[in-house]
């Protein structure tokens, strides 16, 4: 399983990746991770991902989410933002979940369960 974390802040991205890794280890889910620290870096990617945590925030994060959904209908997208404004928009793009900052481990667990179809 390929998982991408898109976050401008490196420390926040590392924490999010660590929580996702913990979840994958706990439930024995083989996964490869990649962090993207800018929207342009994510836009120029070549790989496809099973799960994307989109945490660029604001209009930029939402635009990246829309762009991703247009090219990949199967990807489980978890939108992370510090305002509830994008929660409704998230539904329109068929995102798997929405996390309101600050992100906690329990939020990652819920999102991963949803992304995996409740299997674990």
What residues fall within each predicted segment?
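C-terminal output helix
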Residues: 103-112
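Two-component/phosphorelay signaling modules centered on CheY-like receiver
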Residues: 9-34
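The C-terminal output helix
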Residues: 113-120
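Acidic, metal-coordinating helix/loop segments flanking the phosphotransfer/catalytic sites
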Residues: 35-51
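A short, hydrophobic beta-strand element within the central beta-sheet of small alpha/beta folds
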Residues: 53-54, 74-85
């Amino acid at each position: 399983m390929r998982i991408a974390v898109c976050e401008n802040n490196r420390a926040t991205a590392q924490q999010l990746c660590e929580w996702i890794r913990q979840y994958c280890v706990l439930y024995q889910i083989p996964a490869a991770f990649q962090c993207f620290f800018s929207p342009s870096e994510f836009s120029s990617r070549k790989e496809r991902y099973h799960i994307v945590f989109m945490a660029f925030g604001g209009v930029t994060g939402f635009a990246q989410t829309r762009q991703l959904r247009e090219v990949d209908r199967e990807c489980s997208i978890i939108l992370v933002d510090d305002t509830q404004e994008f929660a409704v928009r998230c539904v329109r793009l068929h995102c798997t979940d929405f996390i309101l900052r600050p992100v906690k481990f329990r939020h990652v667990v819920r999102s991963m369960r949803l992304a995996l179809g409740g299997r674990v």
